[in-house]
Each structure stands twice: as C-alpha cells, then as structure tokens.
C-alpha cells in the first residue's frame, strides 16, 4: 500500500511539473513572438520583398538636411528606437551608379564588405578597360599603412576625382573623397552656410531615375542603415552612423532596391537576415503549438482519468462516509417497512419463559405462540424487537422477512375464517421429562384475545 501511494505521489508530481513547464513555455513563446514581430520578423520580410541588389552600387552623398518638429520629420535616415516618435531628424540623399566593380581597380575592397561567389567576382576585361586607362604602377599613391590605392578615371568629357580606399582613416574600407574643399561644412559634413554646394547644379526636378543621359543611375535617393531606418545600440548607433555618411561628396558602397530604386541601404547581409528570420519563427511558434497540444490533451484526457479512477484521499474519505450513511438510511427504511413482519419475544415475568408473538402487517398484535412449562401462567412482559434472522438486515434477511410476512398474512386469513365460525382453540401437549404446552392465540384489536 505504501509503495502504491509513493508511486502515485511521484506520478502526480511529475504531471504537475510537466504541466507547469508547458504553461510557462507557451506563455514565453507567445510573448517572444509578439516581441520579435516588429523588430526582427517584419524587417526581415521587408528586406526580402524589396529585392535589394546584392552587387553593390557606388553611392555619393548628395544632400544632408536636419529638421526639427514632428510635422517636418516625415522620415529620418537613422533613428534609435523604431517605435518612438521623432522630433529631430537627419535626412541624407545620395546619388548612385550601378555596379561598383566598374569604378574600382581591385576586388579586395568589395571582398571586405560582401562575400560573393567566385564567378560573380570575375568581370569581362572589356568593361574595365573601356572605362578607364590603367595607370602605371609608379603613379599609385600609398598611405602609411599600405592599405590605400588611388587611380584616375576618365569619363568622356569629365574627369572623376581621385579615390582612395583603405582603413587608414577609420572608414572601415569605404570609398572616401580625397578633397580639401570642406569649408562651409560642419564636423558631420552638414552644410551650415550659404556657400555653394557641390551639387547645386542638379535641381530637384532632375531627381529620380536618370537613365543613360547621366553618369548617375539615380539622383536623390534616400539613404538608410537598413530597410526600416532604425535600430538599437550596440547593433546600430545612429550618432556614429550619421558622422560617417552626412559629409557631402562622401563615396561608399550601397545597395538599392529593385522594387523602389529611391530606397538605398548602407549594409546588406541576406544570409544573416534569413537566419534571423528562421530563428525568430522556428523557435517560438513550434514551442507555442506543442504547449497548446499538450495542455489540451492533459485537460481532456489525463486529468479526467485521474478524477474518475484515483480521486484525492480527502475526497475518497468523504465519499466513504457518505456511502456508509446512505447504507444506514436504506437499512433503516427497510426495517421500517418490514416492522410488520418482525417478531417480538414476550418474556414471562413469573417463569422467565419466552413467548414468540407475531405482529400483523396492519400493525396490531396477531398470532402469538408461547412456550412455557406446564401449569404456568403466561402474562405479558417486556417486548424485545428482533429481526427474523436475529441479526442486522441483509438481502437474505429481507427475503426471509418477506417469507415470514407471507406466512403471517396467511395465518391471519385463516384466523379470520375461524373467528367467523366461532372461537377455535387448539392445544397440543407433549409428555416427557419436561412437559411443555404450546399455546396459540389470535387476537384483533381492540377486541379481546381468544386463548386456548
């Protein structure tokens, strides 16, 4: 019994902790999924749907404006916090040309930013030699760290500025314009005076897709660090990001959207984007579904079976007590119903002999059979109620009581027939060492009792 109780207790504990675990798992999975939707899942899907070109383009900062007030800040190039309202915004617009490889001499620059297949890194020599005339090795300019290289590019009627790329200036390998004309610009490169801008000749009417009539593929594109234009430190620090890209004339690789060419981002990693999307959906959603399935099964199957087969000890004791009370009540009802068929022993006060008296079904005294010594006088004595079997009422005793009632009823009918013809008494005596006389009397209340 003790082993069964311990086994049952261990099973209940295991069931309790398992249920608690799945409840917590489902709760945290749901909240984690709701948290990841605006910060990871939605930006990842948007990045895929916007179809950004994996081959970087050459971007050049065209305009930088700082606005104040919620009405003026319809968009911002970078903001920390994707859900809060913005009251100060920096808007950066860029011009970009397609295929950065056509404007760089070495592939180590692009390999620093993106990982392309070997086939994508090989370009036909015709495209490269037609663009510019290769410079002699002695014409290259090397910086102190040996990471920079410069070249001159002839573009028909115009001459492109000298481009240096490397990590010496802390630009993380971005193309930097080697120009000393920074007057009228703040530390971040934002124009704060009325002096001429490098691109004043380009009017706003000329913004958009340029086609073949311009050296730029698109003019006035909006620049963002990612597709949502927002983030949180340390992944994205807008202060550092703005210092890097707000300077007018800054050249750097960028990625434009095939769906919306006016949208340009500075960083793109499709592999990491897909990986984040898979993790944010493959972990919370199955965990939540498994938790719901288990809790549903436990509620409709496990706990219902336990309640039917193995109730708690306290409830079991209460049920046992109720069953005992119900049995007592039913036995009392049976005794009350069968009281007409019970037997009463009439004790003789003078001789201490017993007299067996039957009670008719109508509740009155009926046929009485007394057993006494010869010559004794039978007088009424105290009544002792006794069941026909002399024990507690059982199904067998109920059957015996029914038979006794039938016999008493038949004797009552015979007695009534005898009373109609007169008083009939019978007496039988047995002679022997002990002389006993059986006396039978039939009486009906409230009339006198006929005795023989």
Curated annotation (Swiss-Prot):
Gene this chain is encoded by: tipE
Bilayer-crossing regions: 21-41, 275-295
GO cellular component: plasma membrane
Protein name as catalogued: Protein tipE
Localization annotation: Membrane
A UniProt-annotated Pfam family: TipE
Residues that carry a glycan: 72, 102, 108, 212, 237
Native source organism of the sequence: Drosophila melanogaster
GO terms under biological process: cellular response to heat; male courtship behavior, veined wing generated song production; regulation of sodium ion transport; sodium ion transport
Annotated segments matching region Disordered: 423-452
Tissue: Preferentially expressed in the central nervous system of developing embryos, weaker expression is seen in the peripheral nervous system. In pupae and adults, expression is seen predominantly in heads, body and legs.
UniProt GO molecular function: sodium channel regulator activity; voltage-gated sodium channel activity
Alphabetic keyword roster: Glycoprotein, Membrane, Transmembrane, Transmembrane helix
UniProt topological domain (Extracellular) ranges: 42-274
Primary subcellular site in the record, as a coarse category: membrane
Topology in membrane: Multi-pass membrane protein
Polar residues composition bias: residue spans: 423-444
Cytoplasmic topological domain residue ranges: 1-20, 296-452
Record's function text: Enhances para sodium channel function. Required during pupal development to rescue adult paralysis and also protects adult flies against heat-induced lethality.
InterPro entries, sorted: TipE (IPR031578)
Domain of life: Eukaryota
């Amino acid at each position: 019994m003790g082993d069964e109780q311990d086994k049952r207790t261990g099973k209940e504990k295991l069931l309790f902790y398992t249920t608690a675990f799945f409840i917590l798992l489902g709760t945290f999975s749901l909240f984690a999924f709701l948290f990841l939707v605006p910060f990871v899942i939605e930006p990842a899907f948007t990045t895929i749907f916007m179809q950004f070109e994996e081959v970087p383009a050459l971007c050049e900062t065209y305009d930088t404006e700082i606005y104040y007030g919620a009405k003026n800040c319809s968009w911002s190039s970078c903001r920390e916090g994707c859900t809060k309202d913005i009251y100060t915004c920096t808007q950066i617009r860029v011009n970009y040309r397609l295929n950065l490889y056509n404007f760089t001499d070495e592939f180590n620059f692009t390999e620093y930013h993106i990982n392309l297949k070997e086939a994508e890194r090989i370009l036909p020599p015709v495209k490269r030699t037609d663009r510019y005339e290769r410079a002699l090795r002695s014409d290259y300019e090397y910086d102190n760290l040996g990471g920079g290289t410069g070249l001159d590019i002839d573009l028909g009627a115009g001459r492109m500025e000298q481009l240096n790329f490397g990590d010496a200036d802390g630009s993380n390998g971005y193309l930097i314009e080697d120009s000393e004309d920074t007057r009228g610009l703040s530390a971040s490169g934002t124009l704060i005076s009325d002096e001429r801008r490098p691109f004043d000749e380009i009017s706003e009417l000329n913004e958009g897709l340029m086609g073949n009539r311009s050296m730029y593929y698109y003019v006035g594109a909006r620049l963002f660090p990612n597709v949502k234009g927002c983030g949180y430190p340390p992944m994205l620090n807008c202060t550092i990001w703005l210092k890097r890209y707000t300077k007018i004339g800054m050249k750097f690789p960028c990625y434009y959207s095939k769906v919306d060419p006016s949208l340009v981002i500075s960083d793109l990693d499709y592999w990491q984007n897909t990986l984040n999307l898979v993790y944010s959906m493959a972990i919370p959603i199955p965990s939540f579904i498994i938790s719901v399935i288990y809790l549903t099964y436990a509620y409709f199957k496990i706990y219902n079976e336990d309640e039917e087969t193995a109730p708690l000890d306290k409830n079991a004791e209460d049920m046992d007590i109720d069953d005992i009370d119900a049995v007592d009540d039913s036995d009392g009802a049976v005794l009350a119903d069968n009281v007409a068929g019970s037997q009463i022993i009439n004790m003789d006060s003078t001789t201490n002999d017993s007299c067996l008296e039957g009670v008719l079904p109508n509740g009155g005294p009926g046929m009485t059979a007394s057993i006494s010594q010869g010559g004794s006088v039978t007088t009424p004595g105290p009544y002792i109620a006794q069941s026909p079997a002399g024990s507690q009422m059982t199904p067998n005793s109920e059957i015996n009581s029914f038979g006794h009632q039938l016999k008493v009823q038949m004797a009552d009918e015979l007695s009534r027939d005898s009373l109609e013809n007169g008083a009939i008494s019978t007496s039988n005596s047995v002679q022997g060492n002990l002389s006993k006389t059986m006396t039978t009397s039939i009486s009906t209340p409230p009339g006198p009792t006929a005795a023989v």
